[in-house]
């Protein structure tokens, strides 16, 4: 499936930043139980999942120590995860997501703590589905990998976080609805199997095969129309999976 790249001649500012994370939240809301939605709304003082989906990025600006919580640096060439090496002191997206899910399930945790941890979980599930948050090739997850995108110098991480999605000519509600229409019951059953670690390594393999695999040998690499067409179905499926999996995790944690 690749419904998005056909709509990419217009630049409208949709990124896997605020708007992209909101799309994940909107998809998740479609698959959350009534109980989980009610509990989430109570913890968020009536705010919706999508409206707080980028809170953790805003929080990070004043709390730099939380930066490593948004990603995990699995070496690009590796095929297996080594948590002791790649997540020292449990400071990575896998450990923090698991830690915060445990807090949400803890009947002794106070409401304010649960509210904060819920916002972290919402954001981190989105982050772990961006393949460049799951790898490192000695280039800070693509942040130090120069590329040329639309004739301008950029870096590979920005292209995947924001640049490619800026071509999608949809608002976030319409995009979430379009993506959700393609999600089947079989997809949901398949995508919710495995663990958070499995999902991260799935993203890591996409980084190997597509984000870097289709990049070519030029330095800086040129992000071509063919590269965009290869990346588009990866991006849309990762947004869909993130929404479905976020709903699955919250349905379990907010019983």
State the predicted function of each range.
Residues 5-6:
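Hydrophobic core
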Residues 9-12:
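N-terminal signal peptide c-region/cleavage motif recognized by signal peptidases
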